[in-house]
A protein has these predicted regions:
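The feature captures the beta-strand-to-loop junction immediately N-terminal to the Walker
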Residues: 37-39
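Helix-to-loop junction immediately C-terminal to a conserved catalytic motif
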Residues: 52
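Conserved post-Walker A/P-loop segment of ABC ATPase nucleotide-binding domains
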Residues: 55-64, 121
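ABC ATPase NBD Q-loop/coupling interface
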Residues: 61-87
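Conserved ABC ATPase "signature" region
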Residues: 67-76, 123-142
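Short coil-to-helix segment of the ABC ATPase nucleotide-binding domain corresponding to the Q-loop/switch region
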Residues: 105-114, 146
Length: 147
């Protein structure tokens, strides 16, 4: 089963003068490990940002399993509704090469804040999920620590 499918993705910057992604297609199957390799400025991060719904594509299709998050219509990407995108964001994320934690937030707050702001979860649900993840990683004793 395809977990991620991107078809004919296009992305430009600077009023369409800088074409970063030109007709890029890829799929990721369940259990598959994929590496995106290329020189600096080749569009790797832009592609991942489009896949994670952090940057809008100019054109193309985007599927997460059987959920269509974006479709191509008249040469432009048209995104699904808010609720559909919210479901997708719950299942897909990425960690940047130089990610940053908020040094003035505890470990627990660093884990709960994105869930509340991005996923719209209530504080109690976000904290419960964060504690599950900390326990899974053997870091339960660090929830009150600061980075």
């Amino acid at each position: 089963m395809k977990l991620l499918q991107m078809n004919h993705v296009q992305k430009s910057f600077n009023d369409d003068t800088l074409h970063v992604l030109k007709d890029i297609s890829l799929s990721v199957e369940k259990g598959e490990v994929v590496a995106i390799i290329g020189p600096s400025g080749s569009g790797k991060s832009t592609l991942l940002r489009c896949a994670a719904l952090l940057t809008d594509m100019d054109d193309g299709e985007l599927f997460y399993g059987d959920i269509q998050a974006a479709r191509s219509e008249n040469g432009r990407a048209v995104y699904a509704g808010k609720e559909t995108l919210k479901r997708v964001r719950e299942k897909f994320g990425l960690v940047f090469q130089s990610f940053n934690l908020f040094p003035h937030y505890s470990v627990l707050k660093n884990l709960t804040d994105p869930q509340i702001r991005v996923l719209g979860r209530d504080k109690e649900t976000a904290q419960q999920r964060a504690r599950q993840l900390l326990e899974k990683m053997g870091l339960s004793d660090k929830e009150g620590a600061y980075p």
